[in-house]
Amino acid sequence: MDTKAFKRALHQSDRYNRKGFGKTTDVSGALESAYQSDLIQSLRQNGYRLQRGEITIRLAEAFGFCWGVERAVAIAYETRQHFPQERIWITNEIIHNPSVNQHLREMSVEFIPCERGEKDFSVVDRGDVVILPAFGASVQEMQLLDEKGCHIVDTTCPWVSKVWNTVEKHKRGAHTSIIHGKYNHEETVATSSFAETYLVVLNLEQAQYVCDYILNGGDRDEFMTRFGKACSAGFDPDRDLERIGIANQTTMLKSETEAIGKLFERTLLKKYGPQALNDHFLAFNTICDATQERQDAMFQLVEEPLDLIVVIGGFNSSNTTHLQEIAIERQIPSFHIDAAERIGPGNRIEHKPLHTDLTTTEPWLPAGPLTIGITSGASTPDKVVEDVIERLFDLQRS
């Protein structure tokens, strides 16, 4: 499928919108009351620091809602204003934040039913409005919705669209796209749909395995057992790893994406030599600025003397998880929560340790003077961060 031609035709359709409906003023009040915070604004103006009693809060200097998320949520609110009577669907969570998605449900925005990973688009009728989330949607989903005669409102983050353009360049050059990401993450599913041939690697360990295979060959069946769910249909590691291009899920850890890119570059250089390297390897910077800024701010925060860190964001939020990883690497006690309600009653917290299920820790907050680091993922509203901070202050009074 010529994905570029399809996108061009879709963008010209009068049933497609990706710029909103000019109703920013109409929805600004609702957005401000639901998501903004005077307390957080005050923290920003006072060196990202706040002390009450024996608790000092130290807030990361880049955190929370990014521009792409703000844009997606605003367009979703505008869509309800523009189509007050129509049935509105969304193909997935608009962003990985439970409170934001709940607000959309309260606005009668319905979520496409999904069972065992399969979406049921039979519920969508001609003339319905369908919102594509900030992560984007696969080409196949867009094509299906277009054929159904739906009004498509596309809130895909422009940084994600940039990655799609990158993998289309890979395709035109007959390069396999090596995508650093989680193969079943919504964004990576969408990105891979624009590629002809692709392989998704989760981390540096998997990338090293692939590079060893490129240089030394190996057991093809073992390779496919390991990556069978993370590659394009008909993928052949003996054929499809001769020409590669690098892309990534925009929310991955910047340092790991860079390390993976350099590893593949060294591998192809070793195999084909400097004269032929450009024929066999393409590198593009598809790391999201907002993701990078939040990670850089977290690296700065963990250099301070902190007793613990609270990381706030959806449990399925990739960028939030990577912020937690930074705290763990520095051996700072960290607690990943998605809402203030996870704290209490009493000195108890329900949180999600890395790579495990939700757990409850009690007591979790040490006695005495404390300096607590706070950060949040790109899908977390300031209001949620405020609620967490206030809950922490409440604990010292209880």
Curated annotation (Swiss-Prot):
CDD domains: lytB_ispH. Binds 1 [4Fe-4S] cluster per subunit. It comes from the Bacteria. The active site is at E187. Its cofactor is [4Fe-4S] cluster. The keyword Acyltransferase does not apply. Isopentenyl diphosphate binds at H96, H185, S317, S318, N319, S379. [4Fe-4S] cluster binds at C66, C157, C288. Keywords: 4Fe-4S, Iron, Iron-sulfur, Isoprene biosynthesis, Metal-binding, Oxidoreductase. It catalyses: isopentenyl diphosphate + 2 oxidized [2Fe-2S]-[ferredoxin] + H2O = (2E)-4-hydroxy-3-methylbut-2-enyl diphosphate + 2 reduced [2Fe-2S]-[ferredoxin] + 2 H(+); dimethylallyl diphosphate + 2 oxidized [2Fe-2S]-[ferredoxin] + H2O = (2E)-4-hydroxy-3-methylbut-2-enyl diphosphate + 2 reduced [2Fe-2S]-[ferredoxin] + 2 H(+). (2E)-4-hydroxy-3-methylbut-2-enyl diphosphate binds at H96, H185, T250, S317, S318, N319, S379. One of its GO terms (biological process) is terpenoid biosynthetic process. Dimethylallyl diphosphate binds at H96, H185, S317, S318, N319, S379. Catalyzes the conversion of 1-hydroxy-2-methyl-2-(E)-butenyl 4-diphosphate (HMBPP) into a mixture of isopentenyl diphosphate (IPP) and dimethylallyl diphosphate (DMAPP). Acts in the terminal step of the DOXP/MEP pathway for isoprenoid precursor biosynthesis. NCBIfam families: ispH_lytB, PRK13371.1. This is 4-hydroxy-3-methylbut-2-enyl diphosphate reductase. It comes from Synechococcus elongatus (strain ATCC 33912 / PCC 7942 / FACHB-805). The lineage of its organism: Bacteria, Bacillati, Cyanobacteriota, Cyanophyceae, Synechococcales.
